[in-house]
Curated annotation (Swiss-Prot):
Name the record gives this protein: Triplex capsid protein 1
Source organism of this protein record: Alcelaphine herpesvirus 1 (strain C500) (AlHV-1)
Quaternary organization: Interacts with TRX2, MCP and capsid vertex component 2/CVC2.
GO cellular component, one term: viral capsid
Presence of the UniProt keyword S-adenosyl-L-methionine in the record: no
Assigned protein family: Belongs to the herpesviridae TRX1 protein family.
């Protein structure tokens, strides 16, 4: 006959077992206090018994411990050889032109210097860039034939609908037929492999420091903080009987609204001249220029100028360190 177990007996048994186990001393850990090496080794062994292997790797994504902590974004382009000169400095801005007839796998990239040569700007416009462009690319370079329907796009002031800013140059692998061009499209300016810092490099002829060039107080512009933004403008100017596009880069620590006012003041004479010359009132060609944001940097960092000597010619460039690439699309300012 099976006896019925009293719940109180089980409760008393559990209590007795718990009290009995409390009388047993805990397991001791041998840690030497006499020798520093022995203490550290014993402490490491003790912690290792209760830690999980690879916990650090499982909690953090790969590369989280490598500078920069905000990872930059890179993109590779395939371009025809000799359309991006091997002399182009690292850190120069890049622009991509979309051709309807170009193979999808082949890109059309321009730097400010190759763009100057491709659109055929005269020598009196940015003379130093003009001289270097013809030395690096030549008068019969392939860059002059890369943009189809250029004249039509310029007549209607619509080149910016096909020309898009993409980033800054990181690497240009030169070859006989195709070049692989690596661009930093967004993020802090670092090399993709060496994690070495990059600088934004702009030909000095194409660079304007708005805060130093114009009397900003006359326009009521106020500093926006400790960050300076670099902008790029593409304007449609009249050179004789032709319309030519020109790139210019501006730096300012003012707000976007104030920068828009300052850029309009900078181009005031050219804007007025285009409106006076456009006697036919062609609404498609009334646009004077567009602008975009290239990125930003700390206002406390100074701007450096240096001379690049290549093939017996020198080019004065402006370099901006500690730069964060943050391109935006074009927007019409006049």
């Amino acid at each position: 006959m099976k006896t019925k177990q009293d719940p109180r007996d089980q409760k008393n048994y559990d209590s007795l077992q718990s009290n009995l186990f409390r009388l047993i001393p805990p397991t001791t850990h041998k840690i030497s206090l006499a020798r520093p090496n022995g203490f550290l080794r014993g402490l490491a062994d003790l912690v290792g018994k209760y830690s999980v292997d690879g916990a650090e790797e499982s909690l953090f994504q790969p590369g989280a411990w490598d500078a920069p902590y905000v990872q930059p974004a890179f993109f590779d382009f395939l371009v025809h050889a000799k359309t991006i000169s091997k002399h182009e400095p690292v850190g120069v801005p890049l622009f991509c032109f979309k051709n309807n007839s170009t193979a999808p796998s082949i890109d059309v990239l321009f730097t400010p210097i190759s763009f100057h040569a491709a659109v055929g700007l005269p020598a009196d416009v940015d003379p130093n860039v003009h001289r270097v462009a013809h030395i690096w690319y030549g008068d019969d370079s392939e860059v002059s034939s890369l943009m189809e329907d250029l004249n039509i796009l310029l007549e209607e002031s619509n080149l910016h609908t096909r020309l898009h800013p993409v980033g800054i140059l990181v690497e240009n692998n030169d070859s006989s037929f195709l070049n692989r061009v690596t661009a930093l499209t967004h993020g802090p300016a670092y090399m993709s492999r060496k994690q070495a810092a990059l600088k934004l490099v702009i030909p000095t002829d194409l660079f304007v420091d708005l805060d130093a060039r114009l009397n900003v107080e006359a326009y009521g512009a106020q500093p926006s903080g400790g960050t300076s933004t670099v902008f790029c403008t593409l304007v449609y100017t009249r050179c004789g009987n032709d319309i030519k596009p020109a790139l210019t880069f501006f730096k300012s620590n003012k707000s976007d609204f104030d920068v828009l006012t300052l850029i309009r003041a900078y181009y005031a004479d050219l804007i007025t001249n285009k409106l006076e010359v456009n006697q036919q009132c062609n609404i498609n060609g009334l646009k004077f220029g567009v602008m975009c944001t290239v990125g930003y940097t700390d206002s406390s960092h100074s701007i450096n100028q240096q001379s690049l000597c290549i093939r017996g010619s020198s080019l004065l460039v402006t370099s901006i360190s500690n730069f964060f690439v943050n391109y935006t699309g074009w927007r019409v300012f006049a």
